[in-house]
Amino acid sequence: MGAIPKNRRVVYHHTMRYVLILMTAPLWAQTMDQLELHQVAASKVQYEGKDAVRLLARPNVANGESYAILKGERFHNGTIEASVAGKPGANAAPDARGFIGIAFRLQGNRYEYIYLRPTNGRADDQVRRNHSVQYGAHPAYDFDRLRRESPEKYESYVDLQPGVWTQYKIVIEGTKARLYVNGAVQPCLIVNDLKLGDSQGGVALWVGPGTEGYFADLKITP
């Protein structure tokens, strides 16, 4: 192998191959040691044809407390992409929705996040469908507060199925974020006033209470 350009980094793939990338972070090249776990159990698995990381939220964990931080990742503006699949776990409560998404700009216990409710995507209740996608800012701005103070502003509909791979992409610039699902040209959720402002911080894989979540194909582009 020749000289490696300074603006690139090499990660060691778990199948004993070297992968050369430009400013990205492929999830399946991460080891469990590179994930800082918060109230989740994590494992490497094969799921629906993909090398993936599975996260299981710990029982009786408060909303917003279960995630896995990518160690050493510092994010400000850019794009975060992943394949995600979420579904209620075996012992989940009846109101579990398979909550799954990405948290960004983590600073201590504060972060922004956009997540999916896969069981809502094809529900027979239109109100539930309208709540398929959600933005929040932990810990002060959870879904309940945002729904009370600004109904329908921070959530929307998108077609989802529990346990099925969904292409997830968020584009973040300053105090704005856009979520694109399954290669759509138009965003399914637009947030023009990120509650933590034009900040920067870490990135985490996020699951909500009762979720069995899978993550693959992660790419972070500044």
Model-identified regions with their sequence ranges:
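Carbohydrate-binding surfaces in secreted/extracellular proteins
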Residues: 160-190
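Short, aromatic/His-centered strand-loop micro-motif at the edge of beta-sheets
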Residues: 141-167
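Short carbohydrate-recognition loop motifs
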Residues: 46-62
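Secretory/extracellular carbohydrate-interaction modules
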Residues: 67-140
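Beta-strand-rich interaction surfaces with strong enrichment in secreted/lumenal proteins
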Residues: 66-73, 102, 154-160, 203-205
